[in-house]
Amino acid sequence: MENKSRYKTIDHVICVEENRKIHVWETLPKENSPKRKNTLIIASGFARRMDHFAGLAEYLSQNGFHVIRYDSLHHVGLSSGTIDEFTMSIGKQSLLAVVDWLNTRKINNLGMLASSLSARIAYASLSEINVSFLITAVGVVNLRYTLERALGFDYLSLPIDELPDNLDFEGHKLGAEVFARDCFDSGWEDLTSTINSMMHLDIPFIAFTANNDDWVKQDEVITLLSSIRSHQCKIYSLLGSSHDLGENLVVLRNFYQSVTKAAIAMDNGCLDIDVDIIEPSFEHLTIAAVNERRMKIEIENQVISLS
């Protein structure tokens, strides 16, 4: 289902089992921009919504990409469910549903960008979907380590019955028991499980790390890449950045530039990101961000009026 509005961003709704809905935002390539082979899916990091990536969508659109974003089920944002029921497997289910929906629309040439926690979900999903390439930014490779750094304690070391009701993750209440059970039952928790998901990867892969990232160890990212047998992969560092890629405008612009360059390079079958890009103006980015925030509020108000 497509929701038409006055905004350039197009809101779609995917209906999945149990009458749940996933909101998907579509940004078309700008007129007269370069032609690209692949549509790019953006999987937002934990506690990040689609509209948080308005600027990146504008960068990619200006450079010819058809861009798809979505809010996961049981997460922050517009899709169904509450974050206290979020699990990594629900994140994976959401990603697979979006890819399947795109395939039904005959959109089959896909590249993927996943950041932070969504990168771990992408790593586990690649054997079940067809994508041309993968880009990750501050991608989590060792979930247990990242959670310990983010939460200040290794909660996955505790027996299930000793866990608190909720874990406070960046101001959001994550249901401790449901999340931990899923981590262990579905094998999400450590670096070894990530390596096992990725060792047979046969598509190009670029991983962006941040040199001031306290939540992801760069040497573990290097270990992951060295375990991939195809060797179609490369690592780049976002200098001056922490795990929060939006901490200031300099870091944010570097992130936008770097990812856009990587997408162009990989769309052309290359891992070298020394390519030219078209940069939107700051005013253009601001307008896009404001419009998407308004659009989000309007959609939320529509849901409230129907309830």
UniProtKB/Swiss-Prot annotation:
Active site positions, chain numbering: S116 (charge relay system), D213 (charge relay system), H243 (charge relay system)
Family as reported in the entry's similarity comment: Belongs to the LuxD family.
Protein name (Swiss-Prot/TrEMBL): Acyl transferase
Record-listed E.C. numbers: 2.3.1.-
Pathway: Lipid metabolism; fatty acid reduction for biolumincescence
BP GO terms, sorted: bioluminescence; fatty acid metabolic process
Keywords per UniProt: Acyltransferase, Luminescence, Transferase
Top-level EC class as recorded in UniProt: transferase
Originating species: Photorhabdus luminescens (Xenorhabdus luminescens)
A Pfam family recorded for this sequence: Acyl_transf_2
Its job: Acyl transferase is part of the fatty acid reductase system required for aldehyde biosynthesis; it produces fatty acids for the luminescent reaction.
SUPFAM superfamilies in the record: alpha/beta-Hydrolases
Entry's Gene Ontology molecular function annotations: acyltransferase activity, transferring groups other than amino-acyl groups
